[in-house]
């Protein structure tokens, strides 16, 4: 079930290629390393989960792949092109609910990136409605963000990201602030949408359960300054009741050094909240 991250020479069909990337930030005259050395590939239409301890650089690495942070070392390439800035081939969804424009309607929020990329108002609106229907929000097109629940706001953000028809969808703990029932519902919807649109997904989470529900492979990062501890294939495990699923959950807990009593409390809380 487990595998060491493949070397770059071993993967010839990668959409995303992370090659010995180092990331960090300056505090005065001192450079603090957040990600020491990360190398992995992502194949087209693959669902990759980044998981690791808090503060290990998961979100920093995601933003670097999105083109928002320049690596201090190594290279990031998408579709064979080195990533130096944001581009329409990548779209990102954050955790925060305030990522929508409060003065624009749901339809206008989704259409906005299409308009700034040169689409006519009519074409942008038609495309936006198509993706609102995909996320089951077409009936809320005329509402404003303050009239939406947290889950609905995240679905708008997903629709807006998908409207660009990116090759790579980047998601930074988008369901982390939602209640368990809404989170599980959106996880199921996301799996369906990604399969239908054939989008490549890179998803950051701190939840082992979420990683197992959403991922094809899970990339485990160590403590900061982090590196890739292991790349784990989580396909074909079956549901939570299977032995394979339980063994994989235990393996990921071991890699992340999660205490058994804390993990059990989280599982019990999710079971109660989820009904």
Residue ranges of each PLM-predicted region?
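A short, flexible loop at the N-terminus of ABC-type nucleotide-binding domains that lies
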Residues: 8-15, 24-37
């Amino acid at each position: 079930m487990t595998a060491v991250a493949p070397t770059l020479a071993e993967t010839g069909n990668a959409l995303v290629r992370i090659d010995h990337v180092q990331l960090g930030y300056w505090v005065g005259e001192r450079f603090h390393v957040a990600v020491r050395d990360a190398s992995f590939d992502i194949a087209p239409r693959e669902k990759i989960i980044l998981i690791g301890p808090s503060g290990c650089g998961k979100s920093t690495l995601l933003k670097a792949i999105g083109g928002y942070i320049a690596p201090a070392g190594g290279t990031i390439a998408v579709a064979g092109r080195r990533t130096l800035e944001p581009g329409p081939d990548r779209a990102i969804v954050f955790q925060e609910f305030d990522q929508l424009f409060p003065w624009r309607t749901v339809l206008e929020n989704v259409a906005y990136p299409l308009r700034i990329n040169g689409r006519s108002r009519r074409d942008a609106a038609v495309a936006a409605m198509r993706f609102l229907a995909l996320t089951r929000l077409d009936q809320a097109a005329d509402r404003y963000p303050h009239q939406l629940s947290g889950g609905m706001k995240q679905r708008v953000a997903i629709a807006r990201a998908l409207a660009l028809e990116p090759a790579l969808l980047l998601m930074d703990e988008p369901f982390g602030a939602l209640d368990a029932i809404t989170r599980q519902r959106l996880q199921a919807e996301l799996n369906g949408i990604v399969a239908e649109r054939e989008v490549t997904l890179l998803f950051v989470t701190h939840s082992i359960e979420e990683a197992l529900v959403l991922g094809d492979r899970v990339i485990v990062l160590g403590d900061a300054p982090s590196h890739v501890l292991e790349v784990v294939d989580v396909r074909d495990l079956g549901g939570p009741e299977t032995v394979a699923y339980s063994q994989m959950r235990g393996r990921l807990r071991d890699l992340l050094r999660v205490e058994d009593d804390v993990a059990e409390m989280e599982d019990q809380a999710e079971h109660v909240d989820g009904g």
